[in-house]
Amino acid sequence: MAEKMGILGRKIGVTRIFASDGSAVAVTVIKAGPCPVTQVKTVATDGYDAIQIAFDEAKEKHLNKPEIGHLAKAGKGLFRTLREIRLEAPAAYEVGSELDVTLFATGDRVKVSGTSIGKGYQGVMRRWNFAGSKDTHGCEKVHRSGGSIGNNTFPGHVFKGKKMAGHWGNESVTVLNLEVVDVRPEDNVILVKGSVPGPKNGLVMVRKQ
């Protein structure tokens, strides 16, 4: 399925700017691009239409020989991260061309994908917002437990998807319908209203919606 065009970037942090009416607007600063096109895929050669973009310059010692050879074809240097974007008309892009923040304009709506902050192993009260058990009156050693996880003989197993303690965070998250507040091509920066997933300096993909 074809996607809207986008670029890779890094989440710099959160700040606020002031609108023309004097109101404060919380924004996330994303340093995005420039992202060179390293490969153009078509139905004839690869079975589907897409372009591959690169981001985050890297040293040769951090890449293997196949990666170095592949990036050399684009002639734009070495990069740490590669991503594909499926498009309906990839022929409009050439290997070696660059994508930058001028893809976006103030007022555009975008979706931002990233990896959420990992919280480690957490109990049900923090992970799923369970209320927990009573503090007193017959309750012993199970104040923060999740309670029963199923019946006995029937069904005889725990249903898939049951909310229990476990690893929380460090998973792919996409936030939709974020407004582009400002675009600053001279700094390769876009300002997006609201929050985006991931820690500071985390890798994100910003796509048109």
Curated annotation (Swiss-Prot):
Q: Could you identify this protein by its name?
A: Large ribosomal subunit protein uL3
NCBIfam families recorded for this chain? L3_bact
- A GO-annotated cellular component: cytosolic large ribosomal subunit
Asked if the keyword Ribonucleoprotein belongs to this entry, the reply reads yes
Assembly notes: Part of the 50S ribosomal subunit. Forms a cluster with proteins L14 and L19.
UniProt KW keywords: Ribonucleoprotein, Ribosomal protein, RNA-binding, rRNA-binding
Q: Which InterPro entries would you find in this protein's record?
A: Ribosomal_uL3, Ribosomal_uL3_bac/org-type, Transl_B-barrel_sf
- Source species taxonomy: Bacteria, Pseudomonadati, Thermodesulfobacteriota, Desulfovibrionia, Desulfovibrionales
Q: What does this protein do?
A: One of the primary rRNA binding proteins, it binds directly near the 3'-end of the 23S rRNA, where it nucleates assembly of the 50S subunit.
Q: Does the keyword Acyltransferase apply?
A: no
Which residues pair up as cystines?
none
Q: Which family does it belong to?
A: Belongs to the universal ribosomal protein uL3 family.
A Gene Ontology BP annotation from the UniProt entry: translation
What PANTHER family does UniProt report for this protein, alphabetically? 50S RIBOSOMAL PROTEIN L3 (PTHR11229), LARGE RIBOSOMAL SUBUNIT PROTEIN UL3C (PTHR11229:SF16)
Q: Look up the domain of life of the source.
A: Bacteria
One Gene Ontology molecular-function label: rRNA binding
